Amino acid sequence: MRVVILGSGVVGVASAWYLNQAGHEVTVIDREPGAALETSAANAGQISPGYAAPWAAPGVPLKAIKWMFQRHAPLAVRLDGTQFQLKWMWQMLRNCDTSHYMENKGRMVRLAEYSRDCLKALRAETNIQYEGRQGGTLQLFRTEQQYENATRDIVVLEDAGVPYQLLESSRLAEVEPALAEVAHKLTGGLQLPNDETGDCQLFTQNLARMAEQAGVKFRFNTPVDQLLCDGEQIYGVKCGDEVIKADAYVMAFGSYSTAMLKGIVDIPVYPLKGYSLTIPIAQEDGAPVSTILDETYKIAITRFDNRIRVGGMAEIVGFNTELLQPRRETLEMVVRDLYPRGGHVEQATFWTGLRPMTPDGTPVVGRTRFKNLWLNTGHGTLGWTMACGSGQLLSDLLSGRTPAIPYEDLSVARYSRGFTPSRPGHLHGAHS
């Protein structure tokens, strides 16, 4: 089957890889001159299935009000003048109760754990290089309340069979030795030993090269004007004066998916702006070993070979990509506070990207009402964590194979009234 994939970020390229491996003739289209040059370029670098959780959580509405008056707040909102933003925020607020949080986190962890397994298999099969580390993730708590709240997430981890360690502050240095110097600032941590780290851009570009060698065609520097449809199916992609035709089409444009699908399929994907610093390592024994998550500031500190990536924060501000100095100061403050000897912060590269977020935090993966239009978007801050699993799942569905995990509650249909997913663990055949 001829398949066109729109988007060459980590999700689009992973989709191309798995569809090619399933025997399809794949073409990837992107406006950029190469793969992973937008949202996948400099994300936090963590592959943390156990920490997969929606921003829509109990207590967030009240916290959001408090954060409005804090200099280093992890969340900021600025109205962009669109009804879509208001509707999206309202849907997000409706997901902030405990029952929705547990449901959403459960399916996010399910997909993320599966994705980590897919990445492990891909690594074993291809020996793909991306400065990966398999040293786990350590979530740090600065208050006793945060430490106590961890028990809520532990319930989900236990249900999913995810191993963990809940550590008091005196034991944090067993996992991250450099934290011995700052343990007095912390109340404890939650460590997930099976989590990983890696450079998402390096992974995506290397996978794109391997996919191209396997027969995938990449059409870079090719802006997409619109999808052409006749009411029942898509019959082409208009790129300037050219119409590119295929048997199936996959939307993986990230935050830009919503606008491209306007008038065809309504999807609640909105850009969530984030920032990162990439810092050269100064002292090896003062740098992180793997990934740290600062629960207070919602910031991740990730170790690559000779660099530290510091990333996080969420701004609901539309498609604004301005680099704001106060955000840089927050990232610098957190990394200096936890790893004062770790990196040459003054030499850091500052970056921002737009993560495609759904109100419930879960991506939309699967077929639409059009029989040949498929979605793989809306992964929010977890595109790197979920990319391989989402790509494999999409490939299975499009190819008519039964996926390895429950999938019905991952489709855009969950936003339809009256939608009832199958019981967990029960799998139907593909729709196609």
From Swiss-Prot:
Which cofactor(s) does the record list?
A: FAD
Q: Tell me the name of the encoding gene.
A: dadA
Q: What is the organism of origin for this protein?
A: Shigella boydii serotype 18 (strain CDC 3083-94 / BS512)
Q: What does it do?
A: Oxidative deamination of D-amino acids.
User: According to its UniProt record, which reaction does this protein catalyse?
Assistant: a D-alpha-amino acid + A + H2O = a 2-oxocarboxylate + AH2 + NH4(+)
Q: In which pathway does it act?
A: Amino-acid degradation; D-alanine degradation; NH(3) and pyruvate from D-alanine: step 1/1
Which biological process annotations from GO are given for this protein? D-alanine catabolic process
EC no. given is 1.4.99.-
Q: Which NCBIfam families match?
A: PRK00711.1
GO MF terms listed in the record are: D-amino-acid dehydrogenase activity
**Name of the protein in question:** D-amino acid dehydrogenase
- Give the highest taxon in the source lineage: Bacteria
User: Where, in this chain's numbering, is FAD bound?
Assistant: 3-17
Q: Kindly list the GO CC terms recorded for this protein.
A: cytoplasm; plasma membrane
- What InterPro entries is this protein classified in? DadA (IPR023080), FAD-dep_OxRdtase (IPR006076), FAD/NAD-bd_sf (IPR036188)
The Swiss-Prot or TrEMBL record describes its family as follows: Belongs to the DadA oxidoreductase family.
Q: Which UniProt keywords apply?
A: FAD, Flavoprotein, Oxidoreductase
